[in-house]
């Protein structure tokens, strides 16, 4: 039996060796392919996970931009309302009406001035309580015509100033927070790579790793991530720059808007009747003049380097170099300033962030988005005015209403509607339809995505 087996093996030795080799090679190849497929599958999982994290963090960053905007809105609108006191002018007009009626010995309730009554309506004079009635005495010597002209100019100026400043703030915050969020994500990704691959990498970007703490796996790491906030002085200083628009920059915008409004509306009598289309055309002409002025290059104080030209948009968002320390003093405490000035690297890091931010602000895409935000805001407001005018035309006795052309109305009545809509622009609640629309434009998301994905910056 054993001899037979030996003879059999001897006769088929080459075949057995060949078969064994084939099996061994097949196993090796199979193992190699299986390992490579497993590695590829693992890499795909990691890439998909990373993409999902990027999407989640990007979405969260955009939400943070909106919430930050709403929180800063009262700070932005309050000085604008103090500078353009439309309600104070309406009260002065009301006083003159009362005096005239008193002189005629007629009851106040018999007056029929729908334009003035609308302007003085409590429905939209939500800022009246903030005004000091004693201030109205300053304008006692002005004529009724002067007051109406002031009401016309300041109502429209305030409306457009709010829209332009809010649009600038929206874009500014989206640029700021997406720059920081991208840097934070990169830092976190490097930390993850060094941990999983055993690579020791140093933190060179000096950015905060705390937001979302997506990759921290235990409480000890979470505590370490939180403690890093004290080291991110450059990031805190960078975020402080929104103070400039809120406290100084808006004035330049207001001045440009004011002169443009005077150019277009200066010769129009408040009692002149206009169709909504004619009024929209005038507003659009005013916007075109404003855009031309605020985007025009001008010689200004240097922001990052001597001799650089700038525009009203940039100077309203970023302070000149000699005012940067003043800005930090206004927005931070002494402890922060001491720690910040102790390391020159902090100033260099802030300069890098500001240079990137200014690079975006000088881009034509950003200018186009700012103009688009204003255009959309104007369109939404005019649509609301049209709806209100149509509601006034409805006959409550008819069940089905046939759409009719909106008749011309006095400019004074349109000013009342603009004032009402301006007050809506100051409402920082989450259900503000106009502000929500502005913050969710596709073009704005595209800009944010380009900033967030610019890993070469």
Curated annotation (Swiss-Prot):
It is found in: Peroxisome membrane. GO terms for biological process: protein import into peroxisome membrane. Residues 1-15 are peroxisomal. Residues 37-457 are cytoplasmic. The keyword Magnesium does not apply. GO terms for cellular component: peroxisomal membrane. Its main location: membrane. The chain crosses the membrane at residues 16-36. Belongs to the peroxin-3 family. The first 16 AA of the protein contain topogenic information that is able to direct a reporter protein to the ER. Involved in peroxisome proliferation and/or membrane biosynthesis. Plays a role in the maintenance of the peroxisomal membrane in vivo. This is Peroxisomal biogenesis factor 3. It comes from Pichia angusta.
């Amino acid at each position: 039996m054993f001899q037979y087996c030996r003879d059999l093996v001897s006769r088929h030795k080459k075949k057995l060796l060949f078969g064994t080799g084939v099996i061994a090679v097949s196993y090796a190849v199979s193992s190699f392919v299986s390992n490579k497929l497993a590695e590829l599958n693992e890499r795909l999982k990691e890439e998909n996970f990373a993409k999902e994290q990027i999407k989640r963090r990007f979405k969260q960053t955009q939400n943070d931009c909106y919430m930050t905007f709403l929180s800063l809105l009262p700070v932005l609108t309050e000085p604008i309302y103090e500078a353009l006191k439309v309600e104070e002018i309406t009260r002065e007009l009301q006083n003159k009406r009362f005096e005239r009626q008193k002189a005629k010995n007629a009851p106040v309730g018999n007056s029929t001035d729908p334009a003035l009554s609308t302007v003085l309506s409590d429905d939209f004079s939500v800022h009246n309580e903030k005004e000091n009635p004693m201030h109205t005495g300053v304008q006692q010597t002005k004529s009724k015509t002067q007051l109406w002209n002031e009401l016309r100019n300041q109502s429209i100026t305030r409306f457009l100033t709010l829209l332009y400043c809010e649009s600038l703030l929206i874009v500014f915050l989206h640029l700021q927070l997406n720059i920081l969020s991208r840097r934070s994500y990169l830092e976190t990704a490097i930390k993850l790579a060094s941990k999983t691959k055993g690579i020791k990498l140093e933190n060179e970007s000096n950015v905060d790793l705390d937001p979302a703490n997506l990759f921290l796996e235990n409480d000890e790491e979470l505590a370490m991530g939180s403690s890093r906030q004290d080291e991110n002085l450059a990031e805190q200083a960078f975020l402080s720059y929104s103070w400039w628009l809120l406290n100084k920059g808006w004035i330049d915008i207001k001045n440009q808007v004011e002169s443009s409004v005077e150019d277009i509306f200066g010769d129009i009598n408040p009692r002149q009747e206009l169709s909504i289309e004619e009024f929209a055309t005038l507003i659009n002409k005013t916007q075109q003049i404003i855009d031309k002025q605020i985007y025009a290059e001008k010689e200004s104080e240097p922001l990052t380097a001597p001799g650089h030209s700038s525009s009203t948009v940039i100077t309203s968002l970023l302070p000149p170099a000699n005012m940067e320390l003043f800005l930090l003093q206004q927005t931070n405490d002494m402890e922060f300033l001491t720690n910040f000035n102790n390391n020159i690297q902090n100033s260099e890091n802030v300069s890098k962030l500001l240079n990137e931010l200014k690079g975006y602000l000088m881009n034509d895409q950003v200018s186009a988005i700012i103009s688009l935000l204003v255009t959309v805001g104007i369109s939404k407001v005019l649509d609301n005015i049209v709806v209100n005018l149509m509601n006034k035309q409805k006959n409550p006795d008819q069940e089905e209403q046939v759409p009719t052309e909106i008749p011309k109305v006095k400019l004074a009545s349109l000013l009342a509607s603009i004032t009402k809509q301006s007050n809506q622009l100051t409402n920082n609640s989450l259900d503000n339809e106009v502000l929500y629309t502005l913050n969710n434009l596709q073009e704005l998301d595209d800009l944010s995505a380009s900033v967030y994905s610019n890993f070469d910056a």
